[in-house]
Design a protein with these regions (language model features):
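Feature captures the catalytic ectodomains and active-site-proximal regions of enzymes
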Residues: 8-416
Length: 416
């Protein structure tokens, strides 16, 4: 346990137990908008949020409770899975769930106790080193055809059935399905993704004896796939990360008493939502289509998770201009959400992805919470620096859900 985290882990258990005991039902609506990778850092003096022309977000921030949240702990850079779990009130260290399980669930594969899932990227390998970890973000249709071709040629390795599932752009998932339930630790295998260009792929390495069999099969899988795609111009190699088994995690509705809908175009985020029992139908299109889907289903649910991916993608590409523009595009259609008049509207990110760093970072994430029961008036705009002035301060991400429930008047008094 990280020093100082033991108390925090116990506090998360305590929080969920207490919240469960004081839940009360009403007709209020809670909308959580996640601009993936929202937080940034200054380039030429201003961050992406500070540079963006976002009159609607700025107006909302002036009348909202604002602050900054830390998904894992100070100084710890979170992945997307931990970041989202924390937003939903699950401690990211207690519930360590591999990216593979999330990706596979999001792509419609129901995981069994016999399965190991892994998230895969098509990549460009040149002279033994990774030139591009995302194969130039190859188009989704080309990626789909490549993945379907792999499935036709690779159906089984040793005693494991191999299931390929095409994803978005360079992404896909692989599930190894064994004939019998696996013991704990069977998926404890190091990622082969070096996380940076200019480095060789990481050797497949089991981290415990229970993972040795699967690691050998993964080595054979990589060799077989590479032989098939080696003549592709960009997607001539694969990188694997997030080896995982199906986890057993409490359902969102059981904890919070909320019937919930996830609206996300990227499979991993639908997978995460499904994992905790949210309805997560496939949604296609852009942000406008996501908001249209929200409107169409608004009367059917209590809680809505709306995920917007491209903010993070541009941050990872180091594209400050386009990350800023994507935030502006969201601001332009934000009135469509405001028109629904949810009792609680939260807008934030799952982590920071500064264009300056071209990747996720440890920096606290700006958040605004709009409801009838906040002070407001402390921030002049929505940005990292302005949110430091807000009434929420800097706080653990797992506290967002209790705050949402309280502002929706869904929590009774605790104690006499």
């Amino acid at each position: 346990v990280i020093q100082g985290r033991e108390v925090f882990l116990k506090a998360e258990d305590f929080m969920q137990d207490i919240v469960k005991s004081i839940i009360q039902k009403n007709d209020s609506k809670i909308v959580l908008v996640v601009l993936d990778g929202l937080g940034g850092l200054p380039m030429h003096g201003k961050s992406e949020l500070e540079t963006a022309d976002i009159p609607n977000l700025d107006m909302l921030a002036r009348n909202s409770a604002c602050g900054l949240h830390t998904p894992v702990f100070f100084g710890i850079t979170p992945g997307s899975g931990p970041g989202h779990l924390a937003l939903f009130g699950y401690d990211a260290i207690k519930w360590q769930i591999g990216r593979g399980a999330l990706e596979a669930l999001g792509l419609g594969i129901e995981l069994r106790k016999t399965d190991i899932a892994v998230r895969c990227n098509y990549a460009t390998l040149e002279k033994g080193v990774i030139k591009d970890r995302r194969a130039g973000r190859i188009p989704t249709e080309k990626s789909r055809k490549l993945t379907e071709g792999l499935q036709k040629k690779i159906k089984k390795i040793e005693n494991a059935e191999v299931i390929f599932a095409p994803g978005m752009e360079h992404r896909f998932a692989v599930v190894l399905r064994f004939p019998a339930p696996l013991e704990k630790g069977a998926a404890d295998i190091m990622d082969t993704d070096p996380q940076k260009e200019g480095k060789p792929p990481v050797k497949v390495t089991p981290m415990c004896p229970q993972a040795e069999k699967a690691a050998k099969i993964i080595e054979k899988l990589i060799r077989a796939v590479t032989e098939i795609i080696k003549n592709q111009a960009a997607a001539n190699f694969i990188l694997l990360r997030g080896f995982s088994q199906a986890p057993d995690i409490p359902h969102f509705e059981d904890v919070y008493g909320l019937k919930s809908l996830a609206i996300a175009t990227y499979p991993m985020y639908r997978g995460l939502a499904k994992l905790i029992g949210m309805d997560a139908p496939a949604v296609t299109g852009g942000v406008k289509e996501e908001i249209d889907f929200l409107k169409q289903n608004y009367k059917k649910y209590d809680f809505f998770f709306l995920h917007i991916k491209k903010v993070d993608s541009y941050g990872e590409d180091g594209n400050f201009k386009e990350k800023t523009a994507e935030i502006e595009r969201f601001d332009h259609i934000l009135p469509g959400i405001l028109a629904l008049e949810p009792e609680v509207l939260i807008i934030t990110g799952d982590h920071s992805t500064p264009s300056l760093l071209k990747g996720h970072s440890w920096h606290p994430v700006p958040v605004l919470l709009s409801s009838a029961y906040v002070f407001g008036g402390l921030c002049n705009s929505f940005s990292e620096r302005e949110c430091t002035k807000g009434e929420l301060g800097i706080f653990p991400t797992v506290n967002i859900m209790p705050l949402a429930l309280a502002n929706a008047l869904r929590l009774k008094k605790f104690g006499a």
